């Protein structure tokens, strides 16, 4: 009893193993070519290998009555070249028309490039969507009336491919993006093809016999003339298909054809170099064995077996056998064979698969060869290679679109950030770099004749002459040619506001001057004066705008006059521009203009003396630091609008004079 129960448990725990892989003995082999040739004819054009692996099209070649054999109809109605259906969609529907391109990165699908277009088909509005992934291109046309609400870009992408899982798409801002996209889409379209042509004589059943044939029968010569034109390879200018057109190492002539703007070069076995003593004829197999599709021409009734030729590339064969057709021309029987993983390709063969020589058959045969190569690309071996190539090209396209779009927005990479200090590229940063280099060169020229005593400014734009350490540090920085003191930004809009006010000219306010030195103008009291520049004047400086902390100073501190400043008696004088804002009750910014002695505002060229850069150079004269006086009464000394406050700078002509307040 126990043994019986244990036995049943053992049976329940047993599982069935998968059937073992079939060996050659398990297959029902097809008859070999030698067995078939031992029988009575006629023989088929193609025999499947003993253990399969290929499919055949066109097995019926019985001609009951010759007059009933009809030639193929016009190729424009039934003969069509097959290619990737989505390869030309962008050129046809998007290129040169209003549309939008986006890019993104999906964790599962990889790089994505998305194109969308509003389209009107008939009287109905549609969205035409084209999504490119590393595996394929998805295309769909969706009526807007079928949507409950107008979708965003991510939702549109999910409409055409449900596997999309991204948070957002980034717009493409590069003007030449359409060229890059159409090049990627059409990389699968080829206008150059190379096909092998193998001549099989009666009784030839091996690769060595096929490649050892040198002579050409009249029927084979006629077929080659029908297939294309004979060309000399020396200095041939068309598509050469890997043949040597310079040194003649691959023969002297070949067969070439231009069909529907597609160049075709045929590798004819009898025209390739023949090597004595080489049973394999590697010079011939090197070219034909690397082709994907080959034509096998049979003079007489001898079957062709696809595995006769050992090749990893040859995936499809079109076998043509000549048949006497009387005065109307020869007849050609056609059969097609390809590996199992190659999908069926058109145009389909008629029944019976017999053609009369003529332009219709040439159209059919060349179309069949081109479509065969496109179909072979879908085989497992070529599909993996195509997928890797497509993924690499899509990644390159993604990076190009991303880099150029960032550049158009002025957002550079890490290298640009290190070079520019604050980062960023584009037009504005390029312009700033040009002005900065000009300011540094002018700084070096102006400081060559100056004393090391310099004026240091704080980040708020106010002078700090009583701080010897800070003044010393600023002086050292200014003494070195080509260097400028670095200052922190006063705020996010500091430099922009300086540019808006027009801090381009050096301004000085003098209320009272008893004995002005020779060579200097004495402006009218109460007006902002602009002193003419000398040849050795240093570069004008533009201190940053004051921060909020400095704006809340007490009224008493604003009216203090910093004493102890003197002016150099040198005729070659330089100027220091100091700008401060007097903020009103409502906090509005006040624009200041440079006013001449007659009260007429001066127009200034912001491109010539622009100092709104974030890291603008600050240079001053060789004298001591002047004092800054803020007028407590905005209407004093101002000839214009009394609502606008005025900034005045008190300067002394010599050390003996005491500064006066500009009240």
From Swiss-Prot:
Comp. bias (Polar residues):
450-467, 535-549
Chief location of this protein within or outside the cell: Golgi
Which intervals hold domain Rap-GAP?
Answer: 181-397
Domain GoLoco: where? Answer: 1-17
Q: Which GO terms describe its molecular function?
A: GTPase activator activity; protein homodimerization activity; small GTPase binding
List, alphabetically, the GO terms of the cellular component aspect. Answer: axon; cytosol; dendrite; early endosome; Golgi membrane; neuronal cell body
InterPro entries, A to Z: GoLoco_motif (IPR003109), Rap/Ran-GAP_sf (IPR035974), Rap/Ran_GAP_dom (IPR000331), Rap1_Ran_GAP (IPR050989)
Give the keywords, sorted: Golgi apparatus, GTPase activation, Membrane, Phosphoprotein
What residues bear Phosphoserine in this entry? 441, 484, 499, 515, 541-542
What is this protein's tissue specificity according to the annotation? Detected in brain cortex and striatum (at protein level). Detected in brain cortex and striatum.
Any idea where this protein resides? Golgi apparatus membrane
Q: Where is this region: Disordered?
A: 1-23, 442-646
From the UniProt record, give one GO term of the biological process aspect: positive regulation of phagocytosis
Q: Which stretches are tagged as biased composition: Low complexity?
A: 566-577, 616-631
Q: Where is the composition biased (Acidic residues)?
A: 580-591
**Bilayer topology annotation:** Peripheral membrane protein
Subunit composition and interactions? Homodimer and heterodimer with RAP1B.
- Please explain the role this protein plays, according to its UniProt record: GTPase activator for the nuclear Ras-related regulatory protein RAP-1A (KREV-1), converting it to the putatively inactive GDP-bound state.
In its UniProt entry, what is this protein called? Answer: Rap1 GTPase-activating protein 1
Q: What species does this protein belong to? A: Mus musculus (Mouse)
Gene of this entry: Rap1gap
């Amino acid at each position: 009893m126990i043994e019986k129960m244990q036995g049943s448990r053992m049976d329940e725990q047993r599982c069935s193993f998968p059937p073992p892989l079939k060996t050659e003995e398990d297959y029902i082999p097809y008859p070999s070519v030698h067995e078939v040739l031992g029988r009575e004819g006629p023989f088929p054009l193609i025999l499947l290998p003993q253990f399969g692996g290929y499919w055949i099209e066109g097995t019926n070649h019985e001609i009951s009555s010759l007059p009933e054999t009809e030639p193929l109809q016009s190729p424009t109605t039934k003969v069509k070249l097959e290619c990737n259906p989505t390869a030309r969609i962008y050129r046809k529907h998007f290129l040169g028309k209003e549309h939008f391109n986006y890019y993104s990165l999906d964790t599962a699908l990889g790089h994505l490039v998305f194109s969308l277009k509003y389209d009107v088909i008939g009287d109905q509005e549609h969205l035409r969507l084209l999504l490119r992934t590393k595996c394929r291109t998805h295309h769909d046309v969706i009526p807007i009336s079928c949507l409950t609400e107008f979708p965003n870009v991510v939702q549109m992408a999910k409409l055409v491919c449900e596997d999309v899982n991204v948070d957002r798409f980034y717009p493409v801002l590069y003007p030449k993006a359409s060229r890059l996209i159409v090049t990627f889409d059409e990389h699968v379209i080829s206008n150059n093809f190379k096909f092998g042509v193998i001549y099989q004589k009666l009784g030839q059943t091996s690769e060595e016999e096929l490649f050892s044939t040198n002579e050409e029968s009249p029927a084979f010569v006629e077929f080659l003339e029908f297939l294309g034109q004979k060309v000399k390879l020396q200095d041939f200018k068309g598509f050469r298909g890997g043949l040597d057109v310079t040194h003649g190492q691959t023969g002297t002539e070949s067969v070439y054809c231009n069909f529907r703007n597609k160049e075709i070069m045929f590798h004819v076995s009898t025209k390739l170099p023949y090597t004595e003593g080489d049973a394999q004829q590697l010079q011939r197999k090197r070219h034909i064995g690397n082709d994907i599709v080959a034509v096998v021409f049979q003079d007489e009734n001898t079957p062709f077996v696809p595995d006769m030729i050992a090749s990893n590339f040859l995936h499809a064969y079109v076998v043509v056998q000549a048949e006497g057709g009387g005065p109307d021309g020869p007849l050609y029987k056609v059969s097609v064979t390809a590996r199992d993983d190659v999908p069926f390709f058109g145009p389909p063969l008629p029944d019976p698969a017999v053609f009369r020589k003529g332009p219709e058959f040439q159209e059919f045969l060349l179309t069949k060869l081109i479509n065969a190569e496109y179909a072979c690309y879908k085989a497992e071996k070529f599909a993996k290679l195509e997928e890797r190539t497509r993924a690499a090209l899509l990644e390159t396209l993604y990076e190009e679109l991303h880099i150029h779009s960032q550049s158009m927005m002025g957002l550079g990479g890490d290298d640009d950030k290190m070079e520019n200090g604050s980062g960023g590229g584009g037009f504005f940063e390029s312009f700033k770099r040009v002005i900065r280099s000009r300011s540094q060169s002018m700084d070096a020229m102006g400081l060559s004749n100056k004393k090391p005593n310099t004026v240091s400014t704080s980040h708020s734009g106010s002078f700090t002459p009583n701080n010897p350490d800070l003044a010393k540090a600023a002086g050292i920085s200014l003494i070195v040619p080509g260097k400028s003191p670095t200052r922190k930004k006063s705020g996010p809009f500091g430099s922009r506001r300086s540019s808006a006010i027009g801090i381009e000219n050096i301004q000085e306010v003098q209320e009272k001057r008893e004995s002005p030195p020779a060579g200097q103008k004495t402006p009218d009291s109460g007006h902002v004066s602009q002193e003419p520049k000398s040849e050795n004047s240093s570069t004008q400086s533009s201190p940053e705008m004051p921060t909020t902390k400095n704006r809340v100073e007490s009224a008493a501190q604003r009216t203090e006059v910093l004493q102890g400043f003197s002016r150099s008696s040198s005729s070659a004088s330089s100027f220091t521009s100091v700008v401060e804002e007097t903020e009103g009750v409502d906090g509005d910014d006040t624009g200041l203009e440079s006013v001449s002695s007659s009260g007429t505002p001066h127009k200034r060229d912001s491109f010539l003396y622009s100092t709104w850069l974030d890291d603008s150079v600050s240079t001053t004269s060789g004298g001591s630091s002047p004092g800054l006086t803020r007028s407590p009464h905005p209407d004093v000394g101002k000839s214009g609008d009394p609502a606008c406050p005025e900034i005045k700078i008190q300067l002394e002509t010599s050390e003996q004079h005491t500064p006066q307040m500009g009240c």
